[in-house]
């Protein structure tokens, strides 16, 4: 059928095509049928939804979908039934526990990106991967397909280094130190980062406090070739676009298939042209990987996948049993990270982890002899070279290179929790800290978060401050206080835990 485009002033986040009920009846189209909207060489696929918001002879598409294509208001298009994609058969094959061939995986990924697969079909694929898994042949094929269906970065400066943490630890602003340290040593490190999904601040959320993070691929190439590094948001790029779509299904189902997680991380490294990749796997209670045994198994998978992609991968299994540094939340973390770069000093957990990871990268890149990388990283940090490089990165990304950490605004609605008893800090609950910071407004409210005054093993007296909640709004502060009282994120115990009498 022929119809005219009507742009709906809404952002659906889905490829839904609104069709008038009379038109649908005449064209024998039903809700959720896949259709192709075509005009010349332009085409987009979407699922049918019947609606009286569009008149007869019109087809409605939301503005966010139109932004990705070049259709215009009133343009005449053909609405063509698309049938069931062949990739659905391949998804059913994986649902039955069978191994997928490379061409079948490529078809599934291509149809996800082209929006030929509906949400229910994508969810079925993700669920099948959770239940039946993927072997390394399938993971490698999935990784390459996810990368090659999006944009690829080609930077002349070599070698290209990269670092990625699988996350789970609150306050992980480590890479904001790692990147300028590595770049100051003459290596190239184009770092793309995510925004927070379930955490209180992703690296991109923190960097956005003092510099722009949204750039095109061409702009990133110019920045990196000028200063040797960047700290940007990967979501603004068309890197491994299938990943962004499957993540929505994972989030809705609260699952994270290992094979898909490996492909998600490594496809973006592959697309960025990374040659040497360091994977940080935090391990401990309250993070994604709780045991060293799990971490070692995952490390072997990353290394093997890297070999198949032509990348040299090393893995650092790091301590993740409590927050890194003393701050959680975008602005608070920005202050702490920039202060550490500016002075060469900071919380032990932050400095040790940052220089440890940077040191491994320096050795991988051949600028530090084996066993000397961490020492070299510390020298670069303490000499001020890392701060000078960070200022170059900030300026290249549109920020003020003369920024002062203490001038970064933080939430002025505060509440401080104090120790109810004297003793030693025996545990800090990562998940509770994250939940409280999010309740306070992080990461959407940049100034919201938590400032920690104690860490595990430290002695406290009754009445000593433990942590302060920062918020930008009183209502959010109240929510965070209620949650903190309920979860009690910091545990304090005496040396004598319990007395049992002789009964």
UniProtKB/Swiss-Prot annotation:
Residues noted as binding AMP in the record, renumbered to the chain: 168, 194-199, 203, 264, 288
UniProt catalytic activity: AMP + phosphate = alpha-D-ribose 1,5-bisphosphate + adenine; CMP + phosphate = cytosine + alpha-D-ribose 1,5-bisphosphate; UMP + phosphate = alpha-D-ribose 1,5-bisphosphate + uracil
Induction info: Constitutively expressed (at protein level). Does not respond to the addition of nucleosides.
GO cellular component: cytosol
Keyword Glycosyltransferase (UniProt): yes
Active site residues according to the UniProt entry: 256
Keyword terms: Allosteric enzyme, Glycosyltransferase, Transferase
EC top class, as a word: transferase
Activity control: AMP phosphorolysis is allosterically regulated by the substrate AMP.
Gene3D superfamilies: 1.20.970.50, 2.40.40.20, Nucleoside phosphorylase/phosphoribosyltransferase catalytic domain (3.40.1030.10), Pyrimidine nucleoside phosphorylase-like, C-terminal domain (3.90.1170.30)
InterPro entries reported in the protein's UniProt record: AMP_phosphorylase, Glycosyl_Trfase_fam3, Glycosyl_Trfase_fam3_N_dom, Glycosyl_Trfase_fam3_N_dom_sf, Nuc_phospho_transferase, PYNP-like_C_sf, PYNP_C, Pyrmidine_PPase_CS
Assembly behavior: Forms an exceptionally large macromolecular structure (>40-mers) in solution.
Function: Catalyzes the conversion of AMP and phosphate to adenine and ribose 1,5-bisphosphate (R15P). Exhibits phosphorylase activity toward CMP, dCMP and UMP in addition to AMP. Functions in an archaeal AMP degradation pathway, together with R15P isomerase and RubisCO.
Family, per entry: Belongs to the thymidine/pyrimidine-nucleoside phosphorylase family. Type 2 subfamily.
Designated name of the protein: AMP phosphorylase
Organism: Thermococcus kodakarensis (strain ATCC BAA-918 / JCM 12380 / KOD1) (Pyrococcus kodakaraensis (strain KOD1))
Higher taxonomy: Archaea, Methanobacteriati, Methanobacteriota, Thermococci, Thermococcales
